[in-house]
């Protein structure tokens, strides 16, 4: 079941919230936060809008928010300002007594939806027949709980863009090959950084149920699921060439969800956290073109007026699904709690959560 199907089963915000002024909504969110105190915890991903992130009790990338969720034993309600797979991860890592809420069920992730459990279960026996028991599955945290559970049960782990290199290196100590899903670009960029040549990487197409590779399949070390981030695929080599031509003294830093060609042409690449820290530590007057989500790029620009910062793609839009979480939905979810009503609760079935926990724990133990 994908996010679009799930959202049909959940509550819809009353239209009255859309007619409120920003000032009124901010005042009411602050009031609910005061009233609920430590019973409420709001984690917010870096890609969230400023109107939402201002109320976050903790901000971070996927790894940081997973760690924060795992450590929080106090909050009764966790209102997650991110996307569906992040809220699922929070539900898995927190106690049964803690309630995880996603303010808008439309906040999904197109990348996570590119790997459905039925597709993975069809692919696995074919790959086993080709390679035997030589494959360890790894999944980017940008995946459904069901995918995480599959990976956990088969001895694998989750990864984030912050620790992908460490986790892929670990995986190669366990098995001869890795099966990386759902983001082919992060998998390819990480394996290449670790010395695996492109000639030893293949792509699994879940639509045609085939392995895309020319040559002797026994040479394959990395099997990449044919998935991608719809935001980061919009950065191209042409954008880099334009910056090199018009601003030759500007450094280019991109997220590893970008294509291999873009990452190779950039000056630097790294996780959201890495990008934030790199810009923060750069000298005043330095010039940067950033290849990642637009809400974050705009926030970095505001935080560093002493530096010249632009988006690598000047026509970039924010992540549309992240943008579903807005001030009206946050206020509605919070005020519903004061009324004794829980809306849009995220609950991962116990059997799925147990398998996913195995994958997450293997990652967190090495984070």
UniProtKB/Swiss-Prot annotation:
<keyword id="KW-0004">4Fe-4S</keyword>
<dbReference type="GO" id="GO:0046872">
    <property type="term" value="F:metal ion binding"/>
</dbReference>
<dbReference type="GO" id="GO:0034628">
    <property type="term" value="P:'de novo' NAD biosynthetic process from L-aspartate"/>
</dbReference>
<keyword id="KW-0963">Cytoplasm</keyword>
<feature type="binding site">
    <location>
        <position position="319"/>
    </location>
    <ligand>
        <name>[4Fe-4S] cluster</name>
    </ligand>
</feature>
<dbReference type="InterPro" id="IPR023515">
    <property type="entry name" value="Quinolinate_synth_A_type3"/>
</dbReference>
<protein>
    <recommendedName>
        <fullName>Quinolinate synthase</fullName>
        <ecNumber>2.5.1.72</ecNumber>
    </recommendedName>
</protein>
<dbReference type="InterPro" id="IPR036094">
    <property type="entry name" value="NadA_sf"/>
</dbReference>
<dbReference type="GO" id="GO:0005829">
    <property type="term" value="C:cytosol"/>
</dbReference>
<keyword id="KW-0808">Transferase</keyword>
<feature type="binding site">
    <location>
        <begin position="140"/>
        <end position="142"/>
    </location>
    <ligand>
        <name>iminosuccinate</name>
    </ligand>
</feature>
<feature type="binding site">
    <location>
        <position position="109"/>
    </location>
    <ligand>
        <name>[4Fe-4S] cluster</name>
    </ligand>
</feature>
<keyword id="KW-0662">Pyridine nucleotide biosynthesis</keyword>
<keyword id="KW-0479">Metal-binding</keyword>
<feature type="binding site">
    <location>
        <position position="161"/>
    </location>
    <ligand>
        <name>iminosuccinate</name>
    </ligand>
</feature>
<comment type="function">
    <text>Catalyzes the condensation of iminoaspartate with dihydroxyacetone phosphate to form quinolinate.</text>
</comment>
<feature type="binding site">
    <location>
        <position position="45"/>
    </location>
    <ligand>
        <name>iminosuccinate</name>
    </ligand>
</feature>
<feature type="binding site">
    <location>
        <position position="272"/>
    </location>
    <ligand>
        <name>iminosuccinate</name>
    </ligand>
</feature>
<comment type="similarity">
    <text>Belongs to the quinolinate synthase family. Type 3 subfamily.</text>
</comment>
<feature type="binding site">
    <location>
        <position position="62"/>
    </location>
    <ligand>
        <name>iminosuccinate</name>
    </ligand>
</feature>
<dbReference type="GO" id="GO:0051539">
    <property type="term" value="F:4 iron, 4 sulfur cluster binding"/>
</dbReference>
<keyword id="KW-0411">Iron-sulfur</keyword>
<keyword id="KW-0408">Iron</keyword>
<dbReference type="GO" id="GO:0008987">
    <property type="term" value="F:quinolinate synthetase A activity"/>
</dbReference>
<dbReference type="InterPro" id="IPR003473">
    <property type="entry name" value="NadA"/>
</dbReference>
<comment type="pathway">
    <text>Cofactor biosynthesis; NAD(+) biosynthesis; quinolinate from iminoaspartate: step 1/1.</text>
</comment>
<feature type="binding site">
    <location>
        <begin position="255"/>
        <end position="257"/>
    </location>
    <ligand>
        <name>iminosuccinate</name>
    </ligand>
</feature>
<feature type="binding site">
    <location>
        <position position="229"/>
    </location>
    <ligand>
        <name>[4Fe-4S] cluster</name>
    </ligand>
</feature>
<dbReference type="Pfam" id="PF02445">
    <property type="entry name" value="NadA"/>
</dbReference>
